[in-house]
Amino acid sequence: MTASFSNFKRHLIAISVACCLTLISFSQNIVVAPYLQNGSPTNMTVMWETDVANDGYVDWGMTAATLTNTVTSASISGEGNNRIHTALITGLNDDTKYFYKVRTFTGIVSATYFFKTHPTKTSEKSLNIVAMSDMQRDGSNPNVFETIINSGIIPVANANYPNGMEDIEAILIPGDLVATGTYSSWRDTYFTPSVGITPYVPTYPVPGNHEYYGTGISLFLDYSDLPLNGSPSNPEEWWYKDISNLRIVGLNSNSPNADL
């Protein structure tokens, strides 16, 4: 083997490795599955998290086979290079079922989910709402939250409502979604166990004292998109939401020093 050919092989290997590293650096994964926030008769908010800073998209439509409408997300910084995405779907019909999926700039695509817009106030439609709290992980019973969803809420809805989870209008969580306000606590102990329901039903949480542990409530606010109709000095901490003829009021009852 000549010296020049040996050098050529080394350069070729180096180029191949560099190309592989470039491809790896631009790969993108969905690390928090899509979940719904802040719905209305005409809008729905979809949020999710990726591990690289690239554009995100929501494709949506009236059927799972016709996701022909697209919304581009806005995003904020998460842990490391992660981005927390928020996409607002507008121009919807009230009390109507839609389908959606999210995808990344690099072509990673989520499963296809559905949601239903809220009924109007004047419809005075009766509602089914799930209210639960204090699902922060207990080390001695770490799977309780997941069990409540997969062995409680979902089968009860499927057995008692004509359209299953589609007939649940909202999930209310008055605090203590997580044990500590860290990224791993949010991803591993709240979002992962709740993936059976949060992509389909909008969630309306308020912070408990556990959300303050470690980071204040910064991650609670980063992972939430709540009505901006409360106190201007504390947006998304006090709010109200009208669903049919029901008004839901969310109140943060914690002091700024709740991390005690």
Which positions does each model-derived feature cover?
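N-terminal secretory signal peptides that target proteins for export/translocation
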Residues: 1-9
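Serine/threonine-rich, low-complexity intrinsically disordered segments
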Residues: 4, 24-26
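Residue-level detector of intrinsically disordered/flexible regions characterized by low predicted structural confidence
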Residues: 9-11, 103
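Divalent metal-dependent phosphoesterase catalytic cores across multiple superfamilies
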Residues: 28-207, 211-237, 242, 258-260
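Residues within helix-turn-helix
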Residues: 254
